[in-house]
Amino acid sequence: MAHGRDRILVTGWFSFLHGEATAGDVLALHRVEEVLRGAGLAHDVVWSPGFRADGTHFAEVDPAAYSRLLFVCGPVHGPQVEELHRRFAHCVRIAVGVSVVDPASPAVTGFDRVLARDGSGSGSGPGLDLSARAPGLPRVPVVGVVLTHGQHEYGGRRRHAEVAAGLTRWLAGKDCARLELETRLDAHDWRLCGTPAQLESVLARLDLVVTDRLHGLVLALRAGVPALVVDPVTGGAKVTAQAHACGWPAVVAAERLVGRRVTGEAEYGEPGYEELGYGELEYGEPEYREPEYGELERWWRWCLADGRDEAARIGAGFRAADAVADAADGLVAVLGAGAGAAAGGTGRRPEA
């Protein structure tokens, strides 16, 4: 952070330790920064350490380094805003793009100028929110996340908790828009889809699905959307089998997302290593090694490139007249055989 007596300090609710950074607030900040840069005005932005740990924080700001303070967006209200007036009393203080709840409150009267978005005290009507004219943003992938924490029938082979923890930690570092989705339908909970058509409509609008569920895989492909799949069962189970049946290659084994702990001097993968659930890893301890994410990264890139066409091809194949056979194709014959066995007292043993 460069200092200069004529610098401007830019603040907002995104600056407070116990504030919050909304997308609208940060876009409003981008609009203000665009204007300041265009005018050649030097400035620094204060961030909450809880949101941007590597940014400039109030704890390290020298008030004497600034002659002006801007407060951007949100309601001008409360003790946190009032504290700005006390700490930066020597600065010209301006609120821009804000809402005024109580014009007589110290939080409002402490500003030298208030450029409100709701028109309060300006003698004019409401103004356009600053976020509307913020600089354009790049598009990022929209990713549906469909995970399960159940399937206890797999007993000791279950790695569902570790897989979910590893996947979500990895996803948190990806520049994408994540949507947590459920294949479970519910007629009463507005958060969940009530019909298959509703869920399929959501899936069809995604760029990618990340899942450890069989139906997360199949429904994504049915919608023509690539799926990055992790089988949560050690050694592989129904998820891996279904991926093979669909002809879908982007499957990662659970073992890749399970951390390992060193016991003694053993090398990675040797008997001296103990398998450890990802959620139990103690970070910072030298004897722990994190899960491998290289395979996830490789399939992520493939799914967002060639995988798009492959998923569309497979999805179209599901609906084709000459689609690959499924178990229902032989159902009528089995039902007929069953009826004959019931009438005649004989029947054939089910096929293995």
Region roles according to the model:
Residues 1-352:
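Active-site anion-handling motifs in enzyme catalytic cores
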